[in-house]
């Protein structure tokens, strides 16, 4: 309403909700086929809060399975319950692209995933809405890589790690279709129906 004095010289009200507007996907063509752009692998080592030497196991393990040199991750804020202060090293991260990226995916799909126990696939809710898929693995998965399994005694500490697949897809549906082409399974968790008894 233009005649409303309360709206005069004021910016329009933003839509409700904290979600940002998604970019408009381009028209479907052979040039806009989603592809795998890069992979981030990171792990957090809580034992490094008390002893920084525990970071060496994570750094060596990530370098062995990716053939790339990882970087140390430092905490941005402090947590009193964990005795963690800002600026302390707590983990490591590595970014891989190109041929090392596809080599890592091949080892993950062909060697690690078939040997994981009680792992039923990546949940469908693992996307961020922009075509990036994240998945977490326990510490037992790290020891299944051939580079780590052959030198298991050289790694005093095994830790879990997270893998983030960055794709050029605009939606999670396209990203899941892309990763399923790499034989990465997805699991749709079905809710159990509760038996409701009707009182007569």
Mark where each language-model region is.
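Short, charge-patterned binding micro-sites
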Residues: 29-48, 74-94
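A glycine-rich, hydrophobic loop/mini-helix early in the fold
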Residues: 36, 56-81
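Long, charge-patterned amphipathic alpha-helical coiled-coil/hairpin "stalk" segments used as oligomerization
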Residues: 69, 81-164
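A common structural junction motif
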Residues: 65-66, 111-119, 182-189
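Active-site phosphate-binding and catalytic loops of NTP-dependent enzymes
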Residues: 2-7, 25-30, 49, 68-74, ...
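Ordered, soluble secondary-structure elements with a strong preference for glycine-centered loop motifs
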Residues: 48-56, 98-103, 169-173
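An acidic, glycine-/histidine-flanked metal-binding catalytic module
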Residues: 155-200
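N-terminal, positively charged regions that mediate nucleic acid binding
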Residues: 1-53
């Amino acid at each position: 309403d233009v005649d409303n004095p309360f709206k005069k010289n004021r910016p329009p009200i933003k839509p409700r909700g904290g979600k940002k507007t998604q970019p408009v996907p381009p028209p479907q063509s052979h040039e806009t086929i989603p592809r795998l752009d890069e992979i981030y692998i990171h792990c957090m080592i809580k034992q490094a809060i008390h002893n920084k030497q525990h970071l060496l196991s994570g750094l060596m393990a990530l370098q062995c399975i990716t053939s790339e040199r990882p970087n140390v991750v430092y905490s941005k804020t402090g947590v009193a319950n964990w005795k963690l202060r800002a600026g302390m090293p707590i983990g490591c991260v590595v970014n891989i692209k190109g041929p090392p990226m596809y080599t890592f995916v091949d080892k993950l799909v062909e060697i690690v995933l078939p040997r994981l126990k009680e792992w039923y696939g990546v949940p469908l809710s693992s996307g961020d809405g922009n075509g990036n898929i994240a998945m977490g693995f326990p510490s037992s998965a790290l020891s299944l890589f051939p580079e780590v399994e052959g030198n298991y005694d050289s790694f005093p500490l095994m830790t879990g790690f997270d893998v983030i697949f960055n794709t050029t897809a605009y939606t999670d549906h396209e990203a899941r279709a892309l990763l399923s082409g790499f034989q990465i399974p997805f699991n749709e968790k079905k809710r159990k129906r509760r038996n409701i008894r009707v009182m007569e």
